[in-house]
């Protein structure tokens, strides 16, 4: 009889939850700070509100539209590769957003690139990894914990972003966030090491 997926000890489960929660906290936390950049960026580049609003609307559209694709890639190539690719795209999108001087550039970076990257480093891919790592009896609870971490990231990053913008300006803050997005790479590696162990465990039972 096969064991349930990832019948891991409590310590391993705690580590899995910590890595998954941190990934979602970083990704969702940064995502929910973008409204703070509207006024300073619009004033700097002499944009009307519609330019920035369109980029954020496009970001939301891309996030939703690419989530099934991110899930497919995670199934086909593994969650680690998707998380790494999404992390790189997120960082590149934030960097490009900092240097965007036209509405088209903003739409391409803050809209298309960041929106697509978020589908690969938020709930769809992370929850898929949890489904393979966490025993079925605790799976719903684990997903609730990670979802709460995303909400905490939103709560935490708003005042952090506000302070950074006040001290470093919007440009410097986007550079800091670009570097922060790269943290998803090592966190993703740490999370998905458990996927390899779980697969090996299932193969031996």
PLM regions with names:
Residues 10-33:
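Pair of pore-lining "gating" transmembrane helices in MFS-fold secondary transporters
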Residues 87, 91-94, 109-110, 178-185:
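A generic transmembrane-helix signature of 12-TM secondary carrier transporters
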Residues 65-104:
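Conserved MFS/SLC helix-loop-helix module at the cytosolic interface between two early adjacent transmembrane helices
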Residues 32, 60-68, 154-155:
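Residue-level signature of mid-helix packing/kink "hotspots" within the transmembrane helices
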Residues 146-197:
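Helix-loop-helix hairpin linking two adjacent transmembrane segments in secondary transporters
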Residues 110-148:
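Cytoplasmic helix-loop-helix junction between adjacent transmembrane helices
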Residues 36-64:
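Extracellular/periplasmic helix-loop-helix junction of adjacent transmembrane segments
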């Amino acid at each position: 009889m096969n064991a349930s997926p990832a019948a891991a000890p409590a310590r391993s489960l705690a580590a899995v939850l910590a890595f998954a929660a941190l990934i979602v906290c970083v990704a969702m936390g940064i995502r929910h700070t973008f409204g703070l950049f509207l006024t300073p960026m619009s004033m700097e580049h002499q944009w009307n509100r519609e330019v920035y609003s369109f980029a954020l609307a496009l970001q939301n559209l891309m996030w939703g539209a690419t989530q099934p694709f991110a899930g497919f890639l995670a199934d086909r190539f593994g969650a680690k590769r998707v998380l790494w690719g999404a992390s790189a795209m997120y960082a590149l999108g934030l960097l490009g957003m900092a240097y965007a001087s036209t509405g088209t550039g903003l739409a391409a970076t803050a809209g298309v690139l960041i929106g697509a990257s978020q589908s690969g480093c938020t709930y769809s891919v992370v929850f898929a990894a949890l489904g393979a790592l966490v025993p079925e009896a605790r799976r719903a609870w684990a997903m609730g914990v990670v979802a709460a971490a995303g909400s905490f990231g939103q709560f935490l990053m708003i005042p952090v972003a506000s302070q950074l913008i006040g001290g470093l300006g919007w440009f410097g803050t986007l550079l800091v966030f670009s570097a922060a997005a790269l943290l998803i790479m090592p966190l993703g590696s740490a999370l998905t090491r458990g996927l390899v162990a779980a697969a090996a465990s299932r193969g031996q039972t």
